[in-house]
Amino acid sequence: DIVLTQSPASLAVSLGQRATISCRASESVDNYDINFMNWFQQKPGQPPKLLIYAASNQGSGVPARFSGSGSGTDFSLNIHPMEEDDTAMYFCQQSKEVPYTFGGGTKLEIK
């Protein structure tokens, strides 16, 4: 299975500032020039919400302050400017190989 190592485990960011979350895969998640890396946001009592798919594409209705980048094994999620509503858990997920696997999560809070 592809192992995803996400960092940091927790992050506190001031309103209006930038939050950056990293995800490293144990092997490349690229295939046919597509990066099979996705990012999800999860709030307590709610299902995960898809923010970013294929490394850099925004999900439906996702605000422009969420962006993704990276290729191969190294990826990042950026949130800028940070808003109060962005307090949540964030997870990377690879969808190159079954079983699809998730990173351990990052808890994002307001500083």
UniProtKB/Swiss-Prot annotation:
Disulfide bonds: C23-C92
Superkingdom in the source lineage: Eukaryota
InterPro entries noted in UniProt: Ig-like_dom, Ig-like_dom_sf, Ig-like_fold, Ig_sub, Ig_V-set, IgV_Light_Chain
Annotated region (Complementarity-determining-2), positions in chain: 54-60
GO biological process terms held by the UniProt record: adaptive immune response; immune response
SUPFAM superfamilies according to UniProt: Immunoglobulin
The keyword Disulfide bond is assigned to this record: yes
A Gene Ontology cellular-component term: immunoglobulin complex
Keyword vocabulary terms for this entry: Adaptive immunity, Disulfide bond, Hybridoma, Immunity, Immunoglobulin
Region feature Framework-2, mapped onto this chain: 39-53
Positions of region (Framework-3): 61-92
Record-linked CDD domains: IgV_L_kappa
Ranges for region Framework-4: 102-111
Region (Complementarity-determining-3): 93-101
Region of interest (Framework-1), ranges: 1-23
UniProt protein name: Ig kappa chain V-III region 50S10.1
Record organism: Mus musculus
Organism phylogeny: Eukaryota, Metazoa, Chordata, Craniata, Vertebrata
